[in-house]
Amino acid sequence: MIPNSIGLKKRMREGQQILGASLSADTDSDRIRAVVDSGPYDFISVDSQHSALSEERLVSFCGLCNELGVFVQFRIKHTRNAYLIGNYLDLGPCGVEVPQTELDETVVESLNSFYFSPEGGRSFGGRARRGAADHLDPVDYGAWWNTYGILWMQIESVEAVTRAHILAKPGVDCLSFGPTDLMFSLKVHPNHHLKTVDDCVAYVARSLEGTGISVCHRIGSSENRQKFADMGVTVLLESASIQT
């Protein structure tokens, strides 16, 4: 769908290992830089699903990251907010993660809201958009964004795991795992052939081989990098541990 990807999107499509760190949107510029350099990390993930986060705070945080040249992946508040993805992106994130994805309709709506025409139907606007100052012409901006922005769909149930190959539609860059909610789902399916979160991660990684769509897992600390890399996970999201 997006043959000429650039930057981080291109690296993900090529199956390169990508490292990210989770940070609060209240983090100041000095700590952002210290965390990114400590990895070194390729992107920062910020969350609104389980965290209080105003639009103004998101604009401010993304502005700081833009000044530092740091890629921001943003998890939206709820699955049903997929129709607002374009609005969220107008506030400055470089990518979006949609939590608790299970239905084809969610993916279709996310793709339409994420990409500009002809790949999608995102509306043009927003002064805080990443890259807005460098691409003033709307058509030029849309073409650039469609090769740059990164869309994750988060899978957090056994049902979503077994349908991963269907949810991984063209234009989706990554399927990410929500291990805690997935653990609850596994307990509801005690006789399923997938018994653990690790089983699910390995299953999805195998099912996406050769598609150019990455698998992301929240791995806690850097000590777990090799374990999940060996499973086929190429996007590793860690908790920022450096103290400043």
Over which residues does each language-model region extend?
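Hydrophobic faces of well-ordered beta-strands that scaffold small-molecule active sites
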Residues: 18-23, 44-46, 72-76, 96-98, ...
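C-terminal alpha-helical cap/extension of soluble enzyme domains
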Residues: 125-133, 152-162, 192, 198-244
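Alpha-helix-loop-beta-strand connector modules within alpha/beta enzyme cores
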Residues: 55-81, 86, 114-124, 141-147, ...
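Conserved N-terminal beta1-alpha1 strand-loop-helix module at the mouth
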Residues: 1-72, 78-79, 169
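N-terminal amphipathic alpha-helix/helix-capping segment at the start of soluble metabolic enzymes
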Residues: 1-22, 133-148, 203, 210
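Conserved anion-binding
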Residues: 95-170, 179-184
